[in-house]
Amino acid sequence: MKKQVTIYTDGACSGNPGPGGWGALLMFGSITREVSGSSPATTNNRMELGAAIEALALLKEPCLVDLYSDSSYLVNAINNGWLQRWQRNSWQTAAKKSVENIDLWQKLIKLLKVHEVRFHKVKGHSDNAYNNRCDQLAREAIKKTS
């Protein structure tokens, strides 16, 4: 039986593009692990994707994951089938433009083959303590890039 893990993620950018950070909480039973990282020159969407990728990559075995994010870009790409369509259309959007962040989407796809992940949208900068903590971790990570 696969372990059930809950992950909250958030990405942030000071300027877009600009220095960015990401934060994540991984929860298994009574254990919570906080992780974060940064990049000196990036975009908010890259940090949102990066948070999910880095958190999933930390799991040491295939897991059942509920992943919560305030990123419509991330959650809608999965839940609305955009990611599958982009792949079928040779990484082109419905408007026939190149999909951005292909490198990160491809990393995420590999992780989604290992873990069974359900994506959930949460309202950002609201009353969700876990999302707010991830935002705080992301913003603290940005400060470390300066």
Curated annotation (Swiss-Prot):
UniProt source species: Chlorobium chlorochromatii (strain CaD3)
Binding site for Mg(2+) 2: 10, 135
Annotated protein name in UniProt: Ribonuclease H
Family: Belongs to the RNase H family.
Keywords from the named record: Cytoplasm, Endonuclease, Hydrolase, Magnesium, Metal-binding, Nuclease
GO biological process: DNA replication, removal of RNA primer
Cofactor: binding details: Binds 1 Mg(2+) ion per subunit. May bind a second metal ion at a regulatory site, or after substrate binding.
InterPro entries membership: RNase_H, RNaseH-like_sf, RNaseH_domain, RNaseH_sf, RNaseHI
Residue ranges of every copy of the RNase H type-1 domain listed in the record: 1-143
EC number: 3.1.26.4
Catalytic activity of the protein: Endonucleolytic cleavage to 5'-phosphomonoester
Major site of localization recorded for this protein: cytoplasm
Gene: rnhA
